């Protein structure tokens, strides 16, 4: 799942996450 680490930050683990408000990442298999 996703682990929130800040206002717009998440640590990705096979899920769609916002990378500290800079870039939106969608990691497989949830692309």
Curated annotation (Swiss-Prot):
Residues spanning the membrane: none
Coiled-coil residue windows: none
Reported tissue expression: Confined to the epidermis and to the mucus layer.
Disulfide bonding pattern of the chain: 2-16, 9-20, 15-26
Gene Ontology MF terms in the entry: sodium channel regulator activity; toxin activity
Subcellular location as annotated: Secreted
Major localization listed first in the record, in broad terms: secreted
UniProt keywords, alphabetically: Disulfide bond, Hydroxylation, Ion channel impairing toxin, Knottin, Neurotoxin, Secreted, Toxin, Voltage-gated sodium channel impairing toxin
Statement: the UniProt record of this protein carries the keyword Transmembrane: no
Keyword Secreted attached: yes
Cellular component aspect of the GO annotation: extracellular region
Reported function: Potent toxin, demonstrating strong inhibitory effects on insect sodium channels (Nav) and reduced activity on mammalian sodium channels. Potently inhibits inactivation of insect sodium channels of B.germanica (BgNav1) (EC(50)=9.5 nM). The toxin also delays the inactivation of most mammalian Nav (human Nav1.1/SCN1A; EC(50)=171.5 nM, rat Nav1.2/SCN2A; EC(50)=50.4 nM, rat Nav1.3/SCN3A; EC(50)=170.2 nM, rat Nav1.4/SCN4A; EC(50)=810.6 nM, human Nav1.5/SCN5A; EC(50)=155.6 nM, mouse Nav1.6/SCN8A; EC(50)=147.6 nM, human Nav1.9/SCN9A; EC(50)=129 nM).
General remark: Negative results: does not show effect on rat Nav1.8/SCN10A.
Family: Belongs to the nemertide family.
Domain comment in the entry: The presence of a 'disulfide through disulfide knot' structurally defines this protein as a knottin.
This protein's name: Nemertide alpha-7
Organism: Lineus ruber (Red bootlace)
């Amino acid at each position: 799942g996703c682990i929130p680490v800040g206002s717009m930050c998440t640590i990705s683990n096979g899920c769609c996450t916002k990378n500290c408000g800079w870039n939106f990442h969608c990691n497989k298999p949830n692309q």
